[in-house]
């Protein structure tokens, strides 16, 4: 139950906070950045 409580609090904080919406955006950005880095690496290999 304690574990669930912790999870609920974490989700609640995320949902309750206005930063919750931009959070997923940031995550997407991070993934995009990672992808970019990967592409860059690939380009280097091609070179």
From Swiss-Prot:
GO terms for biological process: asexual sporulation; sporulation resulting in formation of a cellular spore. Induction: Expressed only in the forespore compartment of sporulating cells. Pfam families: SspP. Keywords: Sporulation. Residues 1-20 have a biased composition (Polar residues). The keyword Membrane does not apply. Residues 29-47 have a biased composition (Basic residues). Its main location: other. Coiled coil: none annotated. It is found in: Spore core. InterPro entries: SASP_SspP. Residues 1-47 are annotated as: Disordered. NCBIfam families: PRK09399.1. Belongs to the SspP family. This is Small, acid-soluble spore protein P. It comes from Bacillus cytotoxicus (strain DSM 22905 / CIP 110041 / 391-98 / NVH 391-98). The gene is sspP.
